[in-house]
Amino acid sequence: MIKLKQLIAATLLLSAAFGAHAERLKDIASISGVRANQLIGYGLVVGLNGTGDQTTQTPFTLQTFNNMLSQFGIKVPAGSGTVQLKNVAAVAVYADLPAFAKPGQTVDITVSSIGNSKSLRGGALLMTPMKGVDGNVYAIAQGNLVVGGFDAEGRDGSKITVNVPSSGRIPGGASVERSVPSGFNQGNTLTLNLNRSDFTTAKRVVDKINELLGPGVAQALDGGSVRVTAPLDPGQRVDYLSILENLEVDPGQTAAKVIINSRTGTIVIGQNVKVSPAAVTHGSLTVTITEDPIVSQPGALSGGQTAVVPRSRVNAQQELHPMFKFGPGTTLDEIVRAVNQVGAAPGDLMAILEALKQAGALQADLIVI
């Protein structure tokens, strides 16, 4: 324990010596096997103000309700399949079970309507078992919903909807009943998985750990994983990881990328994007068609009829932009400044970047999402 305390003190001293670009190891990597697990359940929300499922269109809601009543010894008469339960809705319940969650702890849950319920506002979720992918029950959910949206409708058909009223959350709405087995304390090694695979970052993580703890303690498995030796004692292993996760490492620079969202017009250009020598010009043609009909009025005694004569005007306007030139190794700042000078819109910038990529002048990955 004394040695571990000395290592912690040394870690703090090393961390203080790094520059502003260094990041904690806990922020750029995770421990293999230490992760959250998804849970899901099916249940009923009751207490709705007439905004529940229309059970004639969602028969599974009525079936679920009848099954619940039968568990309390209440037998529903035959032929009640047309009963309308306006205050009940069938819902899906899901949550993330954190790593090392213990029985008795609570987790937040999300509740979403499955049927045609208009709103879950004001409802309460009845006891719902939540299962993992293995089919075992790991938590029990129940509680009053918090719904951020609402829905209102008038008799004349007018309607207003704010946000999504058919989904809500219950903070701390599920109680953990079973822990998920973890291999955290098994074996004499641990694997650190980088959030973003990068060979440079993996090498720097290995170098930093070995610099602090000694040669051979850490070994890179590939560009995304680093294996480190660890104590077998659980308490010492926790102290050991506390040291590692507070190490500050300077991550490697990301690959040059340009991200384009064609639906929203969003363009993100990475810091390392450069352009080879190229000349670019971009203009747009605007065609305007206007209708200005003329009324033809005949003379008083001519016997003719008044007629409307269509008259169309077509105008084409070409916006001319000067050609701008990119020199060798042009940086992001120079690209943005040059494009802004010609007044290019986001759509124009997309076309320019795509053309530069096709010409082989854009030294980056062009990703369209």
From Swiss-Prot:
Belongs to the FlgI family. The keyword Zinc-finger does not apply. This is Flagellar P-ring protein. Residues 1-22 form the signal peptide. The gene is flgI. Keywords: Bacterial flagellum, Periplasm, Signal. One of its GO terms (cellular component) is outer membrane-bounded periplasmic space. The basal body constitutes a major portion of the flagellar organelle and consists of four rings (L,P,S, and M) mounted on a central rod. GO terms for biological process: bacterial-type flagellum-dependent cell motility. Assembles around the rod to form the L-ring and probably protects the motor/basal body from shearing forces during rotation. The lineage of its organism: Bacteria, Pseudomonadati, Pseudomonadota, Gammaproteobacteria, Pseudomonadales. It is found in: Periplasm; Bacterial flagellum basal body. HAMAP family: FlgI.
